[in-house]
């Protein structure tokens, strides 16, 4: 992903303030509520019968935290996202058979969650930078599919 120094500073600076546990659970929960067909990958998580059940499901929260932790780790490798996400790409492609479009959807949900929590601090410039990053991460995660 090519970011200007200003964009990189916005992304890294804002991510340092992210509550990975809370926001990660919220993002994965929102993905499952907004795009219900994604639930088929998480049927073993128990009750996904309603928005409330999903948003309060401890397994959804825990996996969301894991997703955000991986995303944060990826931010340390913006110049080589494909390398940073190679193992996860392989796992999601070969073992889990996740539709790579879901990575793009989750990236957009991640941006929504950041906007919700950071309000005015999540400026149009910050959003533009994050959109570049989530597109790059989605592309890296889909790499094994090509």
Curated annotation (Swiss-Prot):
<keyword id="KW-0007">Acetylation</keyword>
<dbReference type="GO" id="GO:0005833">
    <property type="term" value="C:hemoglobin complex"/>
</dbReference>
<feature type="binding site" description="distal binding residue">
    <location>
        <position position="63"/>
    </location>
    <ligand>
        <name>heme b</name>
    </ligand>
</feature>
<keyword id="KW-0479">Metal-binding</keyword>
<keyword id="KW-0702">S-nitrosylation</keyword>
<dbReference type="GO" id="GO:0020037">
    <property type="term" value="F:heme binding"/>
</dbReference>
<protein>
    <recommendedName>
        <fullName>Hemoglobin subunit beta</fullName>
    </recommendedName>
</protein>
<comment type="similarity">
    <text>Belongs to the globin family.</text>
</comment>
<feature type="modified residue" description="N6-acetyllysine">
    <location>
        <position position="59"/>
    </location>
</feature>
<feature type="domain" description="Globin">
    <location>
        <begin position="2"/>
        <end position="146"/>
    </location>
</feature>
<keyword id="KW-0561">Oxygen transport</keyword>
<dbReference type="GO" id="GO:0043177">
    <property type="term" value="F:organic acid binding"/>
</dbReference>
<feature type="modified residue" description="N-acetylvaline">
    <location>
        <position position="1"/>
    </location>
</feature>
<dbReference type="Pfam" id="PF00042">
    <property type="entry name" value="Globin"/>
</dbReference>
<dbReference type="GO" id="GO:0019825">
    <property type="term" value="F:oxygen binding"/>
</dbReference>
<dbReference type="InterPro" id="IPR050056">
    <property type="entry name" value="Hemoglobin_oxygen_transport"/>
</dbReference>
<dbReference type="GO" id="GO:0031720">
    <property type="term" value="F:haptoglobin binding"/>
</dbReference>
<dbReference type="InterPro" id="IPR002337">
    <property type="entry name" value="Hemoglobin_b"/>
</dbReference>
<dbReference type="GO" id="GO:0046872">
    <property type="term" value="F:metal ion binding"/>
</dbReference>
<keyword id="KW-0408">Iron</keyword>
<feature type="modified residue" description="N6-acetyllysine">
    <location>
        <position position="82"/>
    </location>
</feature>
<dbReference type="GO" id="GO:0031721">
    <property type="term" value="F:hemoglobin alpha binding"/>
</dbReference>
<dbReference type="InterPro" id="IPR009050">
    <property type="entry name" value="Globin-like_sf"/>
</dbReference>
<keyword id="KW-0813">Transport</keyword>
<dbReference type="GO" id="GO:0072562">
    <property type="term" value="C:blood microparticle"/>
</dbReference>
<keyword id="KW-0349">Heme</keyword>
<feature type="binding site" description="proximal binding residue">
    <location>
        <position position="92"/>
    </location>
    <ligand>
        <name>heme b</name>
    </ligand>
</feature>
<comment type="subunit">
    <text>Heterotetramer of two alpha chains and two beta chains.</text>
</comment>
<dbReference type="InterPro" id="IPR000971">
    <property type="entry name" value="Globin"/>
</dbReference>
<dbReference type="GO" id="GO:0004601">
    <property type="term" value="F:peroxidase activity"/>
</dbReference>
<feature type="modified residue" description="S-nitrosocysteine">
    <location>
        <position position="93"/>
    </location>
</feature>
<comment type="function">
    <text>Involved in oxygen transport from the lung to the various peripheral tissues.</text>
</comment>
<dbReference type="GO" id="GO:0005344">
    <property type="term" value="F:oxygen carrier activity"/>
</dbReference>
<dbReference type="GO" id="GO:0031838">
    <property type="term" value="C:haptoglobin-hemoglobin complex"/>
</dbReference>
<dbReference type="InterPro" id="IPR012292">
    <property type="entry name" value="Globin/Proto"/>
</dbReference>
<dbReference type="GO" id="GO:0042744">
    <property type="term" value="P:hydrogen peroxide catabolic process"/>
</dbReference>
<feature type="modified residue" description="N6-acetyllysine">
    <location>
        <position position="144"/>
    </location>
</feature>
